[in-house]
Amino acid sequence: MKINIFFISFSVLVLASCSNAIDADELYGRWDYIAVENFNPPDSLTKEELIAQAPAILFSKDNKLVIEWGGKQLSHGTYKMDGKMIRYTEFLEGGGKREFPFLIKELGEKDLVFQTMEQNYTRVKAKKR
C-alpha cells in the first residue's frame, strides 16, 4: 500500500511539473508593457512614462527577441524556452553577447508577467497587442 501511495504521489508531482513548461508558441507577437516595477530600490514607472516611452518586447517564430523603448530598438538577440525561463542571449555592439534569464510569473492569452533573475529584480507586466 505504501508503495502505491509513493508511486501515485510521484506521478502527480511529475505531471504537475511538466504542466509548468511554457511553449514558445504562447509568446509569439508583440507585448506592450503596462507596468515596470523595480524592487530594490523600490521604484516603478508612471503611466505617463510608459505611454511616452511605449516599451515592448517582441518574440518571433525564429526565436528572435527584440526589446523596444522610446520608439527604438533597445536590445535584440535570440531566446529559447526552458520551462518557465526565457533564456535570452543579447547581441551587443562589437560582436559581443550577454546571456541572462527572465522568469515568467504569469502567462495568459493576452497577459504576461516576467521578471529578471537578479537580486535587484525588475518585474514587467505586459499586454499582447
Question: Over which residues does each language-model region extend?
Answer:
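Sec-dependent N-terminal signal peptides
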Residues: N4-A16
